[in-house]
A protein has these predicted regions:
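N-terminal "arm"/small-domain region of PLP-dependent enzymes with the aminotransferase-like
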Residues: 1-27, 31
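Phosphate-binding glycine-rich loop
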Residues: 26-73, 87-91, 97-99, 164
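Conserved SAM-binding loop
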Residues: 51, 76, 97, 182, ...
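PLP-dependent aminotransferase-like
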Residues: 64-153, 160
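Active-site region of PLP-dependent enzymes
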Residues: 156-162, 169-226
């Protein structure tokens, strides 16, 4: 038996949609990206969505928006793709691995509690194979220790936790549109959030801090007008 790594369903209307973009004035960013962001945020029930080039970039952007930097520790799972830990390193933080539950392969909240130190800044739970983690327990820990929660929902677009779609539960949630994910754009990623301050930071990160909003043009890191 030959089981494919991934098999996509590409139909004629998909091809025509790509042709439409290729014939338009926008090969990047553009109105189609904005429409896609709107569809995803409306589908999951979030207030804001920011599209990026892939799921790894989504995690990187979320860590940046969360203010993770040198000296910070972020707890995540070792049973995941490397990006779930690499995104922490990209921002100068240190990944700390908590063990998983034997029945779900999702991160174990009890071990999260054991791994918390005075340096812990955030938790990145990964919904293994699209199966949501025990978010109630994770949020209880995060509230107790004043931690940010970034859900890695790469495989979990459409998944629900106690009647709520993944993407509405935590400070930020990231999705991937790689060919082996529930929805694919070839490559692609997205971050959703209900927090307007995090949203502005995500927008700046995704556009190299370029903005035409003068109210945002302050601070050491930029932004800059383009």
């Amino acid at each position: 038996m030959n089981i494919p790594y991934g098999k996509q369903t590409i139909e004629e209307d998909d091809i025509q949609a790509v042709v439409e973009v290729l014939k338009s004035d926008y090969l990047t960013t553009g109105p189609h990206v904005g429409a896609f962001e709107d569809k995803v945020k409306n589908y999951v029930g979030a207030k804001y969505a920011v599209a990026v080039s892939n799921g790894t970039a989504a995690l990187h952007a979320a860590c940046y928006a969360a203010g993770i930097g040198p000296g910070d520790e972020v707890i995540t799972t070792p049973i995941t793709f490397a990006a779930s830990a690499n995104c922490i390193r990209y921002c100068g933080g240190t990944p700390v691995f908590a063990d998983v539950c034997a029945d779900t392969y999702n991160i174990n909240p009890q071990d999260i509690e054991r791994k918390i130190t005075e340096k812990t800044k955030a938790i990145i739970p990964v919904h293994f194979a699209g199966q949501p983690c025990d978010m109630d327990a994770i949020h209880e820990i995060a509230k107790k220790h004043n931690l940010i929660v970034i859900e890695d929902g790469a495989h979990a677009l459409g998944a629900e936790y106690k009647g709520k779609k993944v993407g509405t539960l935590s400070d930020m949630t990231t999705f991937s549109f790689h060919p082996v994910k529930p929805v694919t754009t070839g490559e692609g990623g997205m971050i959703v959030t209900d927090n307007p301050e995090l949203y502005q930071k995500l927008l700046l990160f995704h556009s190299h801090c370029i903005t035409r909003d003068q109210s945002l043009m302050k601070g050491y890191e930029g932004p800059w007008y383009y």
